[in-house]
Design a protein with these regions (language model features):
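Extracellular/periplasmic, surface-exposed regions of secreted and cell-surface proteins
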Residues: 294-303, 308-313, 322, 329, ...
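Membrane-proximal, glycine/serine-rich, low-complexity loop/turn segments characteristic
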Residues: 2-4, 8-17, 21-38, 42-112, ...
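Flexible glycine-/small-residue-rich
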Residues: 86, 100-104, 115, 137, ...
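Gram-negative outer-membrane beta-barrel transporters
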Residues: 666-785, 796-798, 807-812, 816-818
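Extracytoplasmic gating/loop element in the C-terminal half of outer-membrane beta-barrel translocons
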Residues: 339-344, 360, 809-901, 906
Length: 941
């Protein structure tokens, strides 16, 4: 668990120095927590008591508890102010979604990720190579990142070597993964009954299946004519295995130190029989290797150099033809066809083609492979200039990153078919003409470059740090240049920053920070590419005042506040185009002589160029308190308010359609957001027993103040005034009981005639009928929760310990859209057992959760409404670890080992939530999330 000096209340540590500063400031505070220096990257160390901005820190002790694929998955649920959510159960695609302080804008809310001072993708950064993760939240903390910092910054600092030492550390993890929520669908006989019930509800004269056929599905007597296939179990095995091995080498001499890491990962996926073909596998497996080298060199008394290198090779394998196996599983009923026929052909028929046979697709459609290659490099030289002026230094850094993705697809087709039944005679099915489709082919090959990214960064700075009696000062002048290019049209991006930052301290208790950043970007229009971002922040260490001396229970107490305006270059997708008139060229016919000629094109105006030359900007205010009380209780609280203005929005709502072309975008959007964050952490040791307990809770809220919304007939239709990502739909008030109930109710004009068992809606606008004008705001955001919290605790006795972290969300909504739950049976799709058990029938009218069955797309039922909406909040055990640290005295006898730890971990073992059928983080026709049991060993030589 988190150490009391390194854990959640690092979240309270507020950076008085930004991450790009290059100086160490020492504190003379008597209290260890307040005086502790924390490395936030690029050789920046700062004192907690000197900090004036809102930053939370996650240390390496916390990031190594999950045995996760990358650092992003390692910090799930951690870091005050950081929302992290899982979005996939497929190992190759496990990369969480992050937000800092919730939803803040209409055009983009993704934070900036920085690794060792350079913007970088974190999906290939392993937890073992990370020293700390800092979450920069307020204007003072993010100012020096210019246009890129408005949504907050996640700053990752990797490990470095140690002078005059040598250490080798090896970690081995073996994980067994299970699907957290394996979907359950009805069996073949139940499916046949459900289809017959749906046909009756739809008014069809004859059932879909005769009673003989329904009985045949249940008897199992005719497995090729009337099959009963569990497609989940036939396609996927019950578990997968992940192995992770890394070895790090830390050390150095008097003037050189190094940190090197080799990290290897392998996950073998869930496909059940992937090796039926010689020479290749169709499994959805994943292999990755990282090689990192961080070096520090003292070139002279006043000159130092740092070099960071990271190479990444990653490869993911999947079934061919871009087969979406889970989409097939969620669509195909168990009664469709057998996996294979008696003749050995793959199953398939005229109703359900063999190309949707998930077993055939997983084994006999070939395979695809993604190759990811990346190299990340940076070099920094720092020169102290005491001969010029004591405390003066200059620094330069260059960085170059290159990443590419190459996609190989080796696909093939296969023959599929099924026997048919012509009729039943004397209680036995009579065979008809067999159905055959598809064809057998060899592997075809195609190779393409899906993407590549190049990024170049250079910066140069001069900084000055000194103390004059009761006064201390640090000041920095810095220039940043960045170029990036991607595998796409008009993707080249240039950014520049010119920044000035000053930190002032008085009597080691009053602190003031000022920053001015002038940023430029080629994303913006000529004449408006540059903008100024000013910030100011201050802190007051009350615990050093004389009037606090007698309060022995107060070890450390500090108040702080910040305000700033952060400019951005955030634009809508392809936003650069909006600065120019948009034209289209099409064919045309015009009268010439005696006929019409069409062998020439015509060009017309398609969209008007914007006249908007403003920047989206974030005005941020933050106030907070940090404290250490009773010799071990660390506490932090932050409250914030932000206004985003000049957000680019479409002006289509302001102009009549008579304009005849697409309306321009203008910077008229305004969004307000506010909230608070609180952290507690308590550590204690009694004899040989150490224990700690802590918690974070964050609350966020947003409101759209302006977005150029088109006038609406009724106020319930207006989204302005509601939260960002607010859902709009109908309010369900039950089901129609019978025809008399329908006749007595207000007419529902939603595209289909209501019938018993259909959803009944509220007349929101009071006009006596239910139509599209009755939509209204329902639920909360479906993108990010408004409440996010965690609880962590741990206890250790003589090396034997237990750590656990729980994480939860609140005020969070979702909408069921999975085929087997939403529109089941429509288009011959399957139906989940949960829907079937909770469907409306005359007998279950009082307890039903879902509408009556239908084989047609019922427009009355299948729309966004509160019946399909669910409470997405959850409370999960993110990770638990039982470990044993071997006594050093025992290890000393080996004359080889310096440390050894044996552990067993559980990852995402259980969830308390409101969704019985799936997981609230990831639901729908996709890979379920995994639960993992991990056995591991860590040894240090």
């Amino acid at each position: 668990m988190k150490n009391n000096k390194n854990a959640v209340l690092m979240a309270m540590a507020l950076l008085s120095l930004p991450a790009s500063a290059q100086v160490k400031i020492d504190s003379i505070a008597p209290h260890r927590y307040a005086a502790q220096s924390i490395d936030v990257g690029a050789n920046v160390n700062f004192s907690r008591e000197q900090s004036t901005s809102a930053v939370s820190v996650i240390t390496s002790e916390s990031t190594n508890k999950r045995s996760a694929k990358n650092i992003g998955n390692s910090i799930l649920g951690q870091g005050s102010g950081l929302i992290s959510l899982q979005n996939s159960g497929n190992y190759a695609g496990i990369n969480p979604t992050f937000y800092i302080r919730g939803m803040q804008s209409l055009d983009g809310n993704t934070p900036l990720f920085v690794v060792d001072g350079i913007e970088r993708d974190i999906q290939y950064i392993s937890a073992e190579e990370v020293e700390s993760v800092s979450v920069l939240k307020d204007a003072a903390a993010t100012a020096l990142y210019g246009y890129k910092g408005a949504n907050g910054v996640v700053l990752i600092t990797t490990k470095r070597g140690k002078f005059n030492s040598k250490e080798i550390k090896v970690n081995l993890d073996h994980a067994i993964n299970f699907m957290a929520h394996k979907p359950k669908f009805v069996d073949a006989q139940t499916y046949a009954k459900a289809m017959n019930e749906a046909y009756a509800n739809d008014g069809f004269e004859n059932p879909r299946y005769t009673q003989e056929e329904v009985d045949a599905f249940g008897s199992g007597k005719y497995p090729y004519l009337y099959p009963n296939v569990n497609w989940v179990d036939e396609t996927f095995r019950n578990h997968s295995v992940t192995n992770m091995l890394n070895a790090s080498f830390t050390g150095g001499g008097e003037k050189f130190k190094y940190y090197a890491l080799l990290d290897l990962q392998y996950d073998n996926g869930f496909v059940k029989n992937p090796d039926t073909h010689e020479g290749y596998s169709t499994n959805n497996k994943y292999v990755k290797g990282n090689l990192r080298m961080n070096m520090d060199m003292i070139l002279s008394k006043n000159t130092t150099m740092k070099v960071n290198l990271l190479g990444v090779l990653a490869e993911s394998n999947a079934p061919g033809n871009s087969a979406s196996l889970w989409d097939m599983v969620y669509s195909l009923p168990s009664a469709a066809f057998a996996v294979k026929g008696e003749d050995g052909k793959w199953g398939g028929n005229s109703t359900w083609a063999g190309t949707v046979n998930p077993v055939a697709q997983s084994q006999d459609a070939g395979y695809s492979r993604n190759h990811n290659r990346g190299i990340y490099t940076d070099l920094t030289i720092r020169q102290e200039l005491p001969a010029v002026l004591k405390g003066l230094a200059v620094q330069g850094r260059i960085a170059y990153d290159h990443f590419s993705n190459i996609y190989e697809n080796y696909s093939k087709t296969y023959v599929y078919g099924s026997p048919t039944v012509a009729d039943w005679l004397n209680g036995e099915p009579q065979l008809g003409k067999a159905f055959t489709g598809g064809s057998e082919s060899d592997l075809g090959a195609s190779i393409s470059t899906n993407s590549f990214t190049r990024r170049f960064h250079a910066d140069a700075s001069a900084d000055y740090q000194n103390t004059f009696g009761a006064h201390s000062i640090y000041s920095q002048l810095k220039y940043d240049y960045e170029f990036s290019d991607e595998f796409a049209i008009n993707s080249t991006l240039y950014r520049q920053n010119i920044s000035w930052y000053t930190h002032y301290g008085l009597l080691d208790r009053y602190f003031l920070d000022l920053a001015l950043v002038e940023s430029g970007s080629n994303r913006l229009a000529p004449g408006s590419k540059w903008a100024l971002s000013p910030t100011v922040s201050a802190a007051w260490v009350l615990s050093k005042e004389n009037f606090m001396k007698n309060l022995n229970w107060v070890d450390f107490l500090k108040l702080r506040a910040s305000y700033g305006i952060i400019q951005t270059d955030i634009l809508p997708e392809s936003g650069w185009m909006y600065y120019m008139q948009q034209y289209q060229t099409t064919g045309g016919s015009y009268p010439f002589n005696s006929g019409f000629q069409s062998d020439f094109g015509r060009t017309y105006l398609d969209a008007i160029a914007t006249s908007c030359l403003t920047h989206e900007k974030a005005a941020k205010f933050n106030a907070g308190v940090d404290a250490t009380l009773f010799g071990g209780l660390d506490f932090s609280f932050d409250g914030f308010y932000q206004r985003r203005s000049n957000i680019w929005v479409s002006t289509a709502g302001k102009y009549s359609s008579e304009l005849g072309v697409d309306a321009p975008y203008e910077g008229d959007g305004i969004v307000d957001s506010w909230g608070w964050e609180a952290s507690l952490d308590y550590n204690k040791q009694i004899g040989d027993v150490k224990f700690n307990i802590g918690a974070n809770i964050d609350y966020y809220r947003s409101q759209i103040k302006e977005q150029d919304e088109a006038p609406k007939l009724y106020p319930n239709l207006v989204s302005t005034g509601h939260r960002v990502s607010q859902l709009f739909g109908y309010k369900a008030i039950g089901f129609f009981k019978d025809q008399a109930d329908i006749d007595a109710s207000k007419p529902q004009l939603l595209g289909s005639t209501p019938r018993p068992g259909d959803i009944k809606y509220e007349d929101v606008n009071g006009d006596g009928q239910i139509d599209t004008n009755d939509k209204t705001a329902i639920g909360y955001s479906t993108v990010a929760p408004e409440i996010y919290y965690n609880i962590h605790l741990g206890v250790e006795w003589k090396g034997l310990g237990v750590d656990a972290m729980f994480q939860g969300t609140g005020r969070y909504s979702g909408v069921l859209s999975t085929k087997s739950m939403y529109k089941p049976l429509v288009g011959n799709t399957t139906i989940s057992q949960y829907y079937y058990d909770n469907r409306w029938t005359p007998e279950t009218a009082g307890t039903a959760k879902f509408p009556a069955l239908s084989s047609t797309s019922n427009a009355n039922n299948y729309n966004t409404n509160t019946l399909w909406m669910f409470d997405r909040s959850f409370f999960k055990l993110r990770n638990i670890e039982v470990y044993y640290n071997f006594p050093k005295a025992m290890l000393a006898k080996t004359k080889l080992l310096n440390a050894a730890k044996l552990y067993v971990r559980g990852v995402d073992l259980f969830s308390f939530d409101h969704l019985d059928e799936s997981d609230p983080e990831v639901f729908g026709a996709t890979n379920p999330l995994n639960r993992s049991i991990v056995a591991g060993l860590s040894v240090t030589f």
